[in-house]
Amino acid sequence: MNKMNQLVRFVKDTVAVRKPQSEDKSYLPIPSTIGGHEVNSPFAEPTAPSLGIIQPKCKRADWLIKSHLTITTNYEIKEWETWDRAISDILDLYDGNPVFKPILLFVYYVLAYNARKIPGPSNGVRYGAYFDELTTVWHAIPELMNQEIDYSYNHRVLHRKIQYVISFKIQMSSTKRRTSPIESFIEVTSEGLKHTPQFTTILDRARFVYSLTGGRYVIHPF
């Protein structure tokens, strides 16, 4: 059997994306909460009214996202904290396009959050997740439209006697087909890992900048 077919697929949620009320359906106003807190600007910093700072618009991007994540270890991982210590290295080691960084790492954490045990080497344990979906992402990244991107991340790390081999691959291409919101793919928590927090808690620990409105994630620049 093809190795990729052994990876666990997400169950596709067919909930339609709510259409914005503005005339331009690719944009929404920035919500007034970021990370659950009230803010007066997109940077969560107080500013003088006389400065006339213009808040960036929230944009909709529709992509076909194909991505997979595999993590091979020499010991079974039992708690999220141990898992998170290894997967979070990418926050410092990411070497791709900086404009795409918030989106790519968001998908990376979705995969890490949904990873399952899959067949692997006889002398180790392998976890994996596979994503191949037509996806809507709302964001407030001015330079980002529906550009295509291809990124790979391969990393080895030793932490507390546990060896991790991490492989992450993602391809994103623009689509005009019917899509599902990215938040519909993050309902399931990691299998067998104790003390797995809510996904928003994981994003906060990784210092993501995002807002939530009506259950919709809006991804901001780092």
Swiss-Prot record:
GO terms for molecular function: structural constituent of virion. Transmembrane segments: none annotated. It is a peripheral membrane protein. A motif (PTAP/PSAP motif) lies at residues 46-49. The keyword Mitochondrion does not apply. Keywords: Host membrane, Host nucleus, Host-virus interaction, Membrane, Viral budding, Viral budding via the host ESCRT complexes, Viral matrix protein, Viral release from host cell, Virion. One of its GO terms (biological process) is viral budding via host ESCRT complex. Its main location: virion. GO terms for cellular component: host cell nuclear membrane; membrane; viral envelope; virion membrane. It is found in: Virion membrane; Host endomembrane system; Host nucleus membrane. Late-budding domains (L domains) are short sequence motifs essential for viral particle budding. They recruit proteins of the host ESCRT machinery (Endosomal Sorting Complex Required for Transport) or ESCRT-associated proteins. M contains a PTAP/PSAP motif, which interacts with the UEV domain of TSG101. Homomultimer. Interacts with viral nucleocapsid. Interacts with host TSG101. Plays a major role in assembly and budding of virion, by recruiting cellular partners of the ESCRT complexes that play a key role in releasing the budding particle from the host membrane. Condensates the ribonucleocapsid core during virus assembly. This is Matrix protein. It comes from Drosophila melanogaster sigma virus (isolate Drosophila/USA/AP30/2005).
